[in-house]
């Protein structure tokens, strides 16, 4: 299956790229610059493409991102600390981000005669991000079937959509993903902050997967209290 992977440079998408390279025909990586404050992740996507020996294309959609205001990922809004399941994490939503990126990716895939576009959406994203849920994925596929009818047959490949981030870590380890060469933190500092939702989720995932986490965090122990509070809330 000739596949283009949407790769942010994060743990999930880099692990997916390594999986595709091992199991299918990886045509290349596609990244998007939408004005995210953690733009350094794109450097990790470029490194992944070089490592796997495939082309890397960055699509500049900063002008679109400029109009998607109010998100902690693009605006001068504080990135909240804590677990992803907390209501405060909704400030990290960039409206329609995945829909926009996927539509562009499908156009690129059709032009390059790819069989699939792969995206690393996963079960842990469902609570906060509506465009990571199975219903969205299924509906987007139907829409693209109509949009490309008679021109190209491209599928949306999302092998992680119903699994946890811990499962992705395990899968990444299986396919020799160099986890130290991935970037998750939304704050875009020198090191992972260890406190934002994606850092907490990353740290927890390694713990649950039983895989050594090579990541350097500014606050390496914050995740313990953040995840404990979430579990306690679930029990109530």
Curated annotation (Swiss-Prot):
Enzyme class: ligase
Catalytic activity: 7-carboxy-7-deazaguanine + NH4(+) + ATP = 7-cyano-7-deazaguanine + ADP + phosphate + H2O + H(+)
Pathway membership: Purine metabolism; 7-cyano-7-deazaguanine biosynthesis
EC number(s) given by UniProt: 6.3.4.20
Homology family: Belongs to the QueC family.
Function of the protein: Catalyzes the ATP-dependent conversion of 7-carboxy-7-deazaguanine (CDG) to 7-cyano-7-deazaguanine (preQ(0)).
The protein's name: 7-cyano-7-deazaguanine synthase
Species for this entry: Sinorhizobium fredii (strain NBRC 101917 / NGR234)
Gene: queC
């Amino acid at each position: 299956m000739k596949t283009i992977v949407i790769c942010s440079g994060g743990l999930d998408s880099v692990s997916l790229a390594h999986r595709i390279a091992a199991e299918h025909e990886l045509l290349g990586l596609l990244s998007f610059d939408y004005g995210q404050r953690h733009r350094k992740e794109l450097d990790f996507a470029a490194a992944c493409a070089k490592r796997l020996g495939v082309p890397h294309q960055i699509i500049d959609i900063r002008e679109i991102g400029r109009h998607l205001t109010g998100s902690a990922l693009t605006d001068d809004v504080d990135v909240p600390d804590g677990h992803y399941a907390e209501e405060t994490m909704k400030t990290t939503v960039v409206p329609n981000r995945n829909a926009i990126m996927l539509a562009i990716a499908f156009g690129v895939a059709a032009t390059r005669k790819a069989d699939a576009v792969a995206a690393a959406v996963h079960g842990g994203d469902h609570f906060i991000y509506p465009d990571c849920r199975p219903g969205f994925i299924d509906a987007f596929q139907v829409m693209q079937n109509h949009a490309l009818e008679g021109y190209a047959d491209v599928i949306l490949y999302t092998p992680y959509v119903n699994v946890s981030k811990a499962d992705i870590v395990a899968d990444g380890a299986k396919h020799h993903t160099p986890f130290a060469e991935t970037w998750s933190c939304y704050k875009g500092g020198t090191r992972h902050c260890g406190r934002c939702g994606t850092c907490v989720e990353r740290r927890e995932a390694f713990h649950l997967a039983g895989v050594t986490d090579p990541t350097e965090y500014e606050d390496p122990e914050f995740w313990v209290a953040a995840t404990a509070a979430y579990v306690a809330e679930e029990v109530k």
